[in-house]
């Protein structure tokens, strides 16, 4: 019986959130606004109305759409230019889990065109199956829709989610899936998670091996 490990992307496997903070500051500067990375840190792990409100408060509602487009394009430019953004141990962990016989899936709120660039840059295009992005659902995390859809694409075998934010943990739990949290930027431990690995993603294979009930 092949168990599936479903990964979030940003902040869990890749440090694009750090790239985004830099791009956010740059976008604000283009608008003539002095903002710091700390100002934009509340955006990490946010989505939907809460994200929109944070952006509107920081750069103005009239500039919100442009701000998001500029920031995303700047991040993609950094990635295409060879920015080092894979989190330490992520690639090794994926290889180890694959060798252990786990099926690897991806569930991210990011748009498909963005995910395609990230996966091409990391060499992970064929690493995950299935892959679900924000372009495949109508509601983003913390809404559990993406994980409900993921469950329909997986055989009736055990599955566990790996997330880095409270928003992601809530989405997985809302779909009835166990979730391991590896806290990301500005994220304290979420004790609603099945487990919290505060040290590193490289601890995940051993944790899974020691907890066969979940995967």
UniProtKB/Swiss-Prot annotation:
GO terms in the biological process aspect are:
DNA repair
Q: Which Gene3D superfamilies match?
A: HAD superfamily/HAD-like (3.40.50.1000), Putative phosphatase, domain 2 (1.10.150.240)
Could you cite one Gene Ontology molecular function of this protein?
phosphoglycolate phosphatase activity
Q: Which GO terms describe its cellular component?
A: cytosol
Similarity remark = Belongs to the HAD-like hydrolase superfamily. CbbY/CbbZ/Gph/YieH family.
This one is known as Uncharacterized protein in fgs 3'region
């Amino acid at each position: 019986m092949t168990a599936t490990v479903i990964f979030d992307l940003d902040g869990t496997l890749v440090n694009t959130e750090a790239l985004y903070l830099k791009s956010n500051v740059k976008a604000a500067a283009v608008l003539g606004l002095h903002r710091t990375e700390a100002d934009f840190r509340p955006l990490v792990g946010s989505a939907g109305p809460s994200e929109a409100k944070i952006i509107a408060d920081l750069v103005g509602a009239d500039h919100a759409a442009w701000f998001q487009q500029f920031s995303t394009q700047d991040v993609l430019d950094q990635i295409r230019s060879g920015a080092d953004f894979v989190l330490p141990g992520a690639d090794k962990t994926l290889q180890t889990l694959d060798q252990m016989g786990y099926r690897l899936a991806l569930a991210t709120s990011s748009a498909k065109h963005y995910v395609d660039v990230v996966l091409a840059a990391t060499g992970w295009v064929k690493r995950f199956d299935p892959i679900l992005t924000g372009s495949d659902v109508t509601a983003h995390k913390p809404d559990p829709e993406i994980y409900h859809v993921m469950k329909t694409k997986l055989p009736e075998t055990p599955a566990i989610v790996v997330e880095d934010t409270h928003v992601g943990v809530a989405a997985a739990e809302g779909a009835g899936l166990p979730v391991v949290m590896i806290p990301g930027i500005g994220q304290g431990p979420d004790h609603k998670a099945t487990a919290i690995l505060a040290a590193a993603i490289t601890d995940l294979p051993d944790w899974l091996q020691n907890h066969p009930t979940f995967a």
